[in-house]
Amino acid sequence: MSGDYSATRKSENVDTSTTASQEDSSLAPEQPEKLVGASDVAAVSNNEPTADEYPHGLRLITLVLAINLAMFLASLDQTILGTAIPKITDEFHGLSQVSWYGSAYFMCLGGFQSTWGKVYKYFPLKISFAIAVFVFELGSLICGVARNSNTFIVGRAIAGIGGAGITSGSTVILAFSAEPAKRPTLMSTMGVTYCIAFILGPLIGGAFSEKVTWRWCFYINLPIGGLAMALFFLFFRTPSVSTTQDATLKEKLLHMDPVGTVLAMGGIISFILALQYAGVSHAWNSSVVIGLLVGFVLIMVTLAAWEYFQGDYAMLPYRLFKRRVMWAGGIFQFFFVGCYFLLLFYLPIYFQSIKGVSAIHSGVDNLPLVLSACLFIILGGAAVEKTHMATPYMTAGSAVAAVATGLLYTLDVDTSSGKWIGYQVLVGAGLAFPFQNALNILQAEVDADDMSPATSSLYFFQILGGAFSISAAQAAFNNRLLHSLTINAPGVSPLLVLATGASDLRSVFSADELPGVILSYMDGLKAAFAVSVGLVGMAFLSSLHMVMIDSCETLHTTGDDGAWKGKEVKELEVERLYVN
């Protein structure tokens, strides 16, 4: 069962006071084989809520609705911008800062995941989640009223900080809202929420941008966020095991690891700026670009050293990353999810700039991808729950996605609708089917005390993948676009092309200039799609490593001969998880 995602925890996490009879009872061979996840072991150690504490009936339904409404907003902000970007570039006059519109949000969404994980561990869960929603709403308001690109980017960053608290807190709250055996089903509601946001995001963004104003893409967050908070406060009761850790205020603030957060943000900003400048305003071999890239490497090395010496104070605890399932899962999510967000940004640009369709129409054209993703993320969750296997789907999904993104690379000016519809369906299937699997594996292997930092650490890699991928795609797009213009439209000013919004090409350039500009845009988009192929290829390689991890970490309840192995052997195998 090399792909089984339910591996048992380290032996010292199990209550050693359990009697022999209880051990024999819990490990009785006549029971159906069931590998125990971290949550189950934590329950044995009284680290789980009792059955009576779990919400049921209407209370559970309303609580899940409230949490998923908040998650819907954070997810919608990841998808709604794609079809709105061409209109935003029209108003703010240029493409030069497009990568920041997405990266500012993703950078903070990922960079503050671990910080919020510590907040939920050391401060009251209910109040912390409310603050996260408030910060997100504040950032959305700033984006809505922004009169220039810089203010808009600041608003996106603030919304990202709040969004980090929402995504991290939602997972923790739902984990405390269901018994371990029912968590995959409950967590799948988040997958459905992602899907709904992915479906509605491009449509809402296009509709607001064309019929009203793109600013309503952010104003809409305010009433929905208020409703989510009202329902949450009415129906959520903090479980007894979710007590805040006993520590002084100074110790709690140290656990937030502000130095680590600043280093992470500094490194990400250096990398994004280097890609933004390179080949556009500065040559790749210029001192500015080289200095930023060298600075990025040095900051990342400093961050790694700082996190190591911080111990449990680190935003990325080293003891968690000693386990391959933690860092290998993070690497997989970095590349895999990054590919998806890249496509959500650049496919609408393809439809609006190359095909010349409206913002609403581009959202409709993007539906094959998001509808396919919605369907297959549900099927993927059901497959994991049915088979108790996760990693084989990660490998298969990334392989399918690699082929599908390769097909997207073949898109051209005159590609038929049948092809781009089919390609998107295939991409959605490959990327969505194993979308939640790394999280499923991780949450099955950590106890209740580590649920929050482990989950937020995984989200750190996942969301940063979006920031890095969008920036890398923008760099590839800009460089290829500028090079292609010298061939296809030598009489057109490259600066004018960069300063023109993607949906304004046909109104700015003459009939003689437009074909060359469109061809150059297509070359730039092909470069962006090539980045997506590379990302999902790296995800495929990391998924192979995840399979090897599961092969040696899964604890079989029986030996090769079918005989019961017993507790002593299991303890030895659990110890092996921490020395490999």
UniProtKB/Swiss-Prot annotation:
Which compartments is it annotated to reside in?
Membrane
- Coiled-coil blocks: none
For this record, an example GO cellular component is: plasma membrane
**Where does the record place the region Disordered?**
1-33
Q: Is Transmembrane a UniProt keyword of this protein?
A: yes
- The keyword Transmembrane helix appears for this protein: yes
UniProt lists compositionally biased (Polar residues) regions at 14-25
Main localisation: membrane
User: What is the top-level taxon of the source organism?
Assistant: Eukaryota
Q: Where are the transmembrane segments?
A: 60-80, 92-112, 125-145, 157-177, 188-208, 216-236, 259-279, 286-306, 331-351, 364-384, 389-409, 421-441, 457-477, 529-549
| Pfam families linked to this entry | MFS_1
The record gives the membrane topology as: Multi-pass membrane protein
- Cite the GO molecular-function annotations of the record: transmembrane transporter activity
**Keyword vocabulary terms for this entry:** Glycoprotein, Membrane, Transmembrane, Transmembrane helix, Transport
Instruction: Indicate which residues are glycosylated according to the record.
Output: N285
**Stated family:** Belongs to the major facilitator superfamily.
PANTHER family, sorted:
MAJOR FACILITATOR SUPERFAMILY, MAJOR FACILITATOR SUPERFAMILY (MFS) PROFILE DOMAIN-CONTAINING PROTEIN-RELATED
Give the function comment from the record. MFS-type transporter; part of the gene cluster that produces the tetronate natural products trihazones.
This chain's protein is named MFS-type transporter thnB
Species name: Trichoderma harzianum
Q: What is the lineage of its organism?
A: Eukaryota, Fungi, Dikarya, Ascomycota, Pezizomycotina
Q: Which gene encodes it?
A: thnB
